[in-house]
Design a protein with these regions (language model features):
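General nucleic-acid-binding
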Residues: 1-28
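Amphipathic alpha-helical segments within well-ordered protein domains
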Residues: 22, 38-39, 57, 81
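Short, Lys/Arg-enriched anionic-surface-contact patches
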Residues: 32-53
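Short, amphipathic alpha-helical "recognition" segments used to contact nucleic acids or chromatin
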Residues: 50-64
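Short helix-capping/linker segments at secondary-structure and domain boundaries
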Residues: 63-69, 92
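Short alpha-helical "recognition helix" segments of helix-turn-helix
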Residues: 68-74, 80
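Short, solvent-exposed alpha-helical "recognition" segments
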Residues: 84-98
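Intrinsically disordered, low-complexity basic tails/linkers immediately adjacent to helix-turn-helix/homeobox/MYB/SANT
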Residues: 97-108
């Protein structure tokens, strides 16, 4: 008793849950409502992790070196490399987002 057991979900259930979460996110138009949703769904550490991942990707896009990011943000190079790989995905959302944010369609 008292042991944490890993909950297993099958692919169909995972897809259904992902589709429903996507629909919820698309329905939220107000930033305060989005903040409430994220507060309900994520722990403080999970929110911090997402924010850190966004900031490191922003740093990478602006040309900051992985070593400088690791030093400045006290992050592992492994984690930063993962963010770099996301930015290199040809059809990746974050690549498109930063291209539009910085009006730079040839970066990375």
């Amino acid at each position: 008793m008292g042991r944490n057991r890993k909950v297993v979900i099958d692919r169909a259930e995972e897809k259904r849950g992902g589709d429903e979460l996507s629909a919820i996110l698309l329905s939220i138009k107000d930033p305060e409502e989005l903040a409430l949703f994220l507060d309900d769904m994520l722990t403080e550490n999970e929110k911090r992790d997402i924010i850190q991942r966004y900031l490191l990707m922003d740093d990478l896009w602006k040309g900051k070196s992985q070593r400088d990011i690791a030093s400045d943000r006290a992050m592992s190079l492994c984690r930063i490399t993962r963010g770099s790989k996301m930015l290199k995905k040809k059809n990746g959302f974050m690549r498109r987002y930063f291209s539009e944010k910085y009006d730079d369609f040839t970066h990375i």
